[in-house]
From Swiss-Prot:
This is Phosphoglycerate kinase. One of its GO terms (biological process) is glycolytic process. Keywords: ATP-binding, Cytoplasm, Glycolysis, Kinase, Nucleotide-binding, Phosphoprotein, Transferase. InterPro entries: Phosphoglycerate_kinase, Phosphoglycerate_kinase_CS, Phosphoglycerate_kinase_N, Phosphoglycerate_kinase_sf. It is found in: Cytoplasm. ATP binds at K201, G292, E323, G350, G351, D352, S353. Its EC number is 2.7.2.3. CDD domains: Phosphoglycerate_kinase. It comes from Bacillus anthracis. PANTHER family: PHOSPHOGLYCERATE KINASE (PTHR11406), PHOSPHOGLYCERATE KINASE 1, CHLOROPLASTIC-RELATED (PTHR11406:SF23). The modification Phosphoserine is found at S183. GO terms for molecular function: ADP binding; ATP binding; phosphoglycerate kinase activity. The lineage of its organism: Bacteria, Bacillati, Bacillota, Bacilli, Bacillales. The gene is pgk.
Amino acid sequence: MNKKSIRDVDLKGKRVFCRVDFNVPMKEGKITDETRIRAALPTIQYLVEQGAKVILASHLGRPKGQAVEELRLTPVAARLGELLGKDVKKADEAFGPVAQEMVAAMNEGDVLVLENVRFYAGEEKNDAELAKEFAALADIFVNDAFGAAHRAHASTAGIADYLPAVSGLLMEKELEVLGKALSNPERPFTAIIGGAKVKDKIGLIRHLLDKVDNLIIGGGLAYTFVKALGHEIGLSLCEDDKIELAKEFMQLAKEKGVNFYMPVDVVITEEFSETATTKIVGIDSIPSNWEGVDIGPKTREIYADVIKNSKLVVWNGPMGVFEMTPFAEGTKAVGQALADAEGTYSVIGGGDSAAAVEKFGMADKMSHISTGGGASLEFMEGKELPGVVCLNDK
């Protein structure tokens, strides 16, 4: 991706409108996970060091175009100040006279957090008037919100019509890592696709079948493939309207010389709970009133072996219902295999896979954890992301 980044422009004394992703989970006004704030720190620190006037914009939650008290960015600005070790000001508006006055009072290296951009109905409609208001605050637009890059909103894309537009360091790294995986991967290249539904991963599987050497299938979506092979799957998740597509994907893999791995055994249960009784059965032996909830031990070994012998692995979606202890072993085993693999570059595609490696304490062993669930999925599907397309070319 040959897009300009903050390293390619002069920032000293410039007012920089930097779109970050501070959409953090909150409980009773407290931030429960600050990963996204920490992920933006290198960009913010770089802007500060370069003597820019740093104006940060983000959304939080889904206020649907109106001010919602508990979705104000005030606690986020306070925590950011602690992490940066400096005074961070907070505006109660995202544009207009109040924001303009606060920007006018800024010195080089100052940091100001604007109010939640989704308090304004024009944000999600990519309204040109709102984009102009944002642009009026600054000299340069920096997009560092990879997590929102698949959205064509006023603060992620529209503003780029009115200002020079470059990526932040986080956005730059995401584009570099994901771009290299798709255009020039080290081989063997393995994709692990899990999660509940085939329909959410159709574009991903189709696009990756042209790129990968190995495709590993797990999670709830695997049972549609199992049924497509003619096996009974009991009460397991299945999308009957996707069975023909599953057959087509398996055929395509064969034609393209892609090794297609599916579960050979599964963990089954009669009840969905933390204390559930489970059994392990072969993939062709699921009883009628039981459901598959995780990949079995033989499958884990096979998958771990493929991972160990890969140079690049992209993982999108868990292998089972990892939120519940009895059904978490498959997802944990894939994470462990990635953590232990030597010389394997691991890319975790945001969302549930990222949550899983966090939960199992393996995050620091992964090469790259994407900060965008939906954005990384769309990027890996080969789609153009509005928040990236709008940036200036090198």
